[in-house]
Each structure stands twice: as structure tokens, then as C-alpha cells.
């Protein structure tokens, strides 16, 4: 139809309230209001957010497929690095690889960080050139069949130092501790605490500077997070990230991120790419 708003107006009961999501553009909402399409308009974002937080079987399959593509892409991304290449040059090649693998492109702007830049969790790729001994952090995600993937792995360009190994192992164990706790009924804040405790016990507590994770689906960051302040219970069908990190200013940073899908009795880890420390180049 040339006027889809008229069709929507015809389908809505003018004697009943109409719930609208917070993201409904004004160019759609205002014409409906002008036509008196409903008795009143109410914000219904909580209901929409709750529905999106609980993935049905088709959505779960889409999340698995997107994450499998992300795993395959990570194996390709690591092959791009060599001495002297810049973060921006690497980042510029990622979307083409995603498209070759069947994805529609990025689910968010990729983070590619070398050396001390990896100590900034939200670093934007720049002209920094890769040098021997640098850590190489990829925080990347693709969009496939409208659903988002998100994963982080941290490598070393050359032989890892003892400190790089220690930090990487601590982050890996924190990731494992959090994943082991994910099941229906577990509280998000307790999952965050499990990862944070591992990092604190290793003496790096002040250097884990962000929440443990976020929910994901049609958008890469959806309402609800895995943090110390979120005491709601985990429920089947929810999908969220587990991404502990240690960030040492002026030195390097390490983050290891996986997506988990909550099942009836535990969780399914959607990423299978190895988490152990590895070298690139």
C-alpha cells in the first residue's frame, strides 16, 4: 500500500489504548495520533523489551548462526596482522570478510587495539602501527539475518611476556567462572561477582573497569545488563555477553568475550573460538 499508516489505523481498535515502543519514530507516531487511531497512546517499551529478551527457537537459531560466522571470521582476522600494519588498516578489511562469510556486515564499529591502546576498553582504531610484543585485541561482531553477534579475543604479536600470560590467564578464568554460574534463577549481579572475584583475587580488581556484559539480539546492546546493580534472575531464552577484562594503562589490556544463551537447565555458549593465549603474525 502507498499509505501503510492508514492500514495500521484500520487494524487498531479506536476504543482501546495503543502501546508504543520507545523507539517508534515520531514520523509514524504523530500521524497515528492525528487520525485518532487509538483511545490513547501509552509507552509499552517494558513489554517489548521483555519479549525481545526471551528468544524463541527461530531467534536462538539466528543467534547461533551469527556467532558461528563470528567465530569463523576471527580465524581470518588474525591472519591480517603483520609488523607495521595499522589498527585502522586492519579494521578496514573486516567487513569484506564478514560479507564473504554470508553476514550483512558489522553489528557495531569494530575495536582493533594494539599494545597500550588495548588498555582502553572503547578504543577506536587509529594509525597506531603493530610492533613486536604488542597485544592485539579484536572486539568484533557481525549482523546476520538481522541478529547480532559479539565476541572479543586478545592475542600477542610475538612471544608473550610472563605478565601478559598472567593477565590473560586471569581474564580467561574469570570468563569461565561467570559462564559456569549461568542458569535459570542465577542473578545477574552474582554472575558479575563471580568474574570480578577471580580478577580481584589475582590483584587486578581496580583494573576491571566496566560491567561484565550486556543483553543482545536484534541490537548489539539491548536493555538489561550483567552488572553489580542488576539483581534480577536469569531466565531461559535470554542471551547476553560475558566479557571480563583487565586494563593496565600505558601497558596493555586483555578482554575475552563470549555470548551465552540461557537454556532450561544451564547455558549454551555460542562461541567456540579458543580462549587460551595465542600468538599472531
Where does each model-flagged region fall?
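Active-site neighborhoods and metal-handling regions in enzymes and metal-associated proteins
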Residues: 1-281
Amino acid at each position: 500500500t502507498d499509505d501503510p499508516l492508514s492500514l495500521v489505523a484500520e487494524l487498531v481498535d479506536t476504543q482501546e489504548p495503543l502501546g508504543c515502543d520507545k523507539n517508534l519514530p515520531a514520523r509514524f507516531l504523530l500521524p497515528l495520533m492525528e487520525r485518532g487511531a487509538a483511545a490513547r497512546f501509552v509507552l509499552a517499551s517494558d513489554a517489548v523489551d521483555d519479549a525481545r529478551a526471551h528468544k524463541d527457537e527461530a531467534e536462538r537459531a539466528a543467534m547461533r548462526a551469527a556467532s558461528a560466522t563470528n567465530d569463523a571470521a576471527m580465524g581470518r582476522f588474525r591472519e591480517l596482522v603483520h609488523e607495521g600494519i595499522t589498527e585502522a588498516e586492519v579494521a578496514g578489511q573486516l567487513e569484506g570478510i564478514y560479507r564473504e562469510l554470508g553476514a550483512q556486515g558489522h553489528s557495531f564499529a569494530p575495536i582493533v587495539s594494539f599494545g597500550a591502546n588495548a588498555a582502553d576498553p572503547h578504543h577506536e582504531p587509529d594509525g597506531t602501527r603493530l610492533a613486536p610484543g604488542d597485544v592485539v585485541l579484536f572486539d568484533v561482531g557481525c549482523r546476520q539475518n538481522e541478529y547480532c553477534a559479539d565476541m572479543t579475543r586478545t592475542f600477542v604479536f610475538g612471544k608473550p611476556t610472563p605478565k601478559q600470560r598472567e593477565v590473560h590467564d586471569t581474564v580467561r578464568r574469570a570468563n569461565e567462572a561467570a559462564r559456569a554460574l549461568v542458569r535459570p534463577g542465577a542473578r545477574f549481579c552474582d554472575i558479575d561477582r563471580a568474574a570480578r572475584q577471580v580478577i580481584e583475587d589475582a590483584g587486578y580488581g581496580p583494573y576491571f573497569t566496566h560491567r561484565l556484559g550486556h543483553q543482545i539480539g536484534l541490537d548489539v546492546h539491548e536493555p538489561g545488563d550483567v552488572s553489580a546493580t542488576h539483581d534480577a534472575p536469569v531466565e531461559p531464552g535470554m542471551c547476553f555477553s560475558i566479557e571480563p577484562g583487565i586494563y593496565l594503562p600505558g601497558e596493555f589490556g586483555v578482554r575475552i568475550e563470549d555470548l551465552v544463551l540461557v537454556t532450561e537447565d544451564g547455558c549454551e555458549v555460542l562461541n567456540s573460538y579458543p580462549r587460551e593465549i595465542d600468538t599472531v603474525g
